From Swiss-Prot:
Gene transcribed to yield this protein: rps13
Job description of the protein: Located at the top of the head of the 30S subunit, it contacts several helices of the 16S rRNA. In the 70S ribosome it contacts the 23S rRNA (bridge B1a) and protein L5 of the 50S subunit (bridge B1b), connecting the 2 subunits; these bridges are implicated in subunit movement.
Segments for region (Disordered): 142-162
Record has Chloroplast as a keyword: no
PANTHER family: 30S RIBOSOMAL PROTEIN S13/40S RIBOSOMAL PROTEIN S18 (PTHR10871), SMALL RIBOSOMAL SUBUNIT PROTEIN US13 (PTHR10871:SF3)
Keyword Endoplasmic reticulum appears in the UniProt entry: no
Protein name: Small ribosomal subunit protein uS13
Amino acid sequence: MLHALQWRKYMAEENNNEELRHLVRIMNTDLKGAKPVEYALTGLPGIGRRTAILIAKGAGVDPTATLGYLPDEEVAKLDAAIGKFEEIVPSWMLNRQKDLTTGQDKHLLGTDILLTFREDINNLKKVRAYRGLRHERGLKVRGQRTKSTGRRGSTVGVSRKK
């Protein structure tokens, strides 16, 4: 069993004695350099493991390689592959299909995904849709039971007879 120091030396020897970069900046986000590429890319909102593997393969980078040891050229390739992800994969794999305003299939990343999600909920509230009303009232939206679960606030005890 290798200790942490021995492991670091082994990894440095394997990667031509390059120093590990602990933070790698991709798409204006700091990603952990100690993780493999397929796990590190999941730090970006809108990218899961499956999409991370496809992005790495599309960029010609080994998904199991440690992100911090990759040279700058390969990190730039990853950044470019993330930008053209919509062209690489079929439309059913994108996270925003048939957008309400444009009707296009898109893959949202970063803060765009959060802003669009919030905008959709506000739109549902504005048109007074059932889902919008449930969101407004802070209740369950997808048809779950609410008789006994999903309660908030402090519990009210039952008073006993003397």
